[in-house]
Amino acid sequence: MATSRDFGREPPRQQQDSDEAGHTLHDGCQHVSEHPQIDVTAHDSSASALPGDETTVGAATAALDPKEEERDPNIVDWDGPDDPANPQNWPPLKKWGNVAVLSIITFMVPLASSMFAPGIPQVLSDFDTNNPSLATFVVSVYILGLAAGPLVLAPMSELYGRVVIYHVGNVLFIIFTVACALSTNMNMLIAFRFLCGLVGAGPIAIGGGTIADLTTLQQRGTAMSVWSLGPLLGPSVGPVAGGFLSQAEGWRWIFWVLAITAGVITIAGLLVLRETHPGTLLERKTRRLRKETGNMNLRSKLDLQVAPRTLFLRSIVRPSKLLVLSPICLVLSVYSAFVYAMIYFMISTFTFVFQDNYGFSEGIVGLVYIALGLGMLFGVVVQQAIGNRIMKRLADKLNKGKPKPEYRIPPTLLAGFLIPTGLFIYGWTVQYHIQWAVPLLGALLAGMGICIINISTNLYLVDAFTLYAASALAASTVLRSIFGATFPLFALQMYETLGLGWGNSLLAFIAVAMFAIPPLLFYYGERLRSHPRFQVKL
């Protein structure tokens, strides 16, 4: 058996870079036990902003002095770069099985947010209310749960590991979904919808970290694309099934079907999902070696040596600090939150718009959401087709082959044109009762633009905040969920006041104004990231 000294070896540079990059999304704080206050907002102009680049993770590299580790025989690390216990070295079937199951869970949670939308008129009738605010809030309150969940679940995953968060969250999700099906009044339904979102936020909050734990840099793009489809495609697909189900069996059966589906997925998760969090795995290894060797001084390479309460509180505060003090994080989060809110704005009103203006039945109106979903799929295809090519071309042309976060921006220029165009088409063609395929084309174009912007902004945040990418993404996710929850609350009232044409035009004008953000970030983003005034102490 290898001694504890063997676990202090510095891995080869290439593998170490990959590990540092792979643990960035949700484990950035775990490499800084001797440097708890680090400037993270900026990387200088010469640094490659891609995860895994040594200059990009300079703070983490400094905190983990390899020479110091070699001098300390009590540091427990992986058994070299090929250690089979390292999730990045798992067999392909095990690795991609985890990715597949996690992606399915991540798809199901947003699916549940909107699958209920076509049944809202039935709920209002059953509970004897005609309050339009309650109609949209029943959908929105779930998103508020998704906004609150990451603030608690992400820090807990750093203390207890990722897989336990998934399993416990899945079981609680089933319980609260059943409670929704059994609700006897509107307040009860709203409360349990919120709890469903709260406990279901785990895959969205920490799923990116699991993907990063499992995959190498070469594999990560494909895995992240598959996983990221869930939060974007799920809300668009849900109402398709929900429409026919509510028409045939009633709105309560939507929740029964969700509970049954979640039960099957939970069983699959228990059978397939395994812990990938490096801090948790190395801590387990440390405890085992302490028992085997009797050396109580052994400690994990990733052990922060701080109280769990301190780590928990620090992790909760970090996203808020980035959102408030970093202009890059704030601007991108607001931009992505606004366009993401358009999904739920449309979802919460499609039923009323197409039933009132085109006479669609509950079952048929669910098919309307397919247009938005197709737009999302086309957006992923376009992003994958042009994103990496543009980034490589700009890096070769402008920076001697070294990528920068700003090179993620160009695809958003296309998206910034698609969103207002789609909103104008959708709003005015519905206003004048143009054949239903035309407004759906507008919804498709808007969905395509929404998808491209969300993927591009997430990639920018990961590249720019490499060490604390998880916190930057958490900040963006929370703001995005808040926008997604609140926009539907005034959707119907805005349509009643302005009409469908001018109501959607107002949103389109805001999107046009925000179109200035991408070029400004492309030309001035690096300057903002490196400016001393905007360095954030975390």
Curated annotation (Swiss-Prot):
Membrane topology label: Multi-pass membrane protein
Transmembrane feature ranges: 100-120, 134-154, 163-183, 194-214, 225-245, 253-273, 327-347, 362-382, 409-429, 436-456, 482-502, 505-525
Main location: membrane
The organism's place on the tree of life at top rank: Eukaryota
The entry's keywords: Cell membrane, Membrane, Transmembrane, Transmembrane helix, Transport
Gene3D superfamilies for this protein: MFS general substrate transporter like domains
PROSITE patterns xref list: MFS
Annotated coiled-coil segments of the chain: none
Compartments where found: Cell membrane
Pfam families attached to this UniProt entry: MFS_1
Cellular component terms per the entry's GO annotation: plasma membrane
Molecular function terms from GO: transmembrane transporter activity
Family per record: Belongs to the major facilitator superfamily.
Function: Efflux pump that might be required for efficient secretion of radicicol or other secondary metabolies produced by the radicicol gene cluster.
Name the UniProt record assigns to this protein: Efflux pump radE
Native source species: Floropilus chiversii
Gene name of this polypeptide: radE
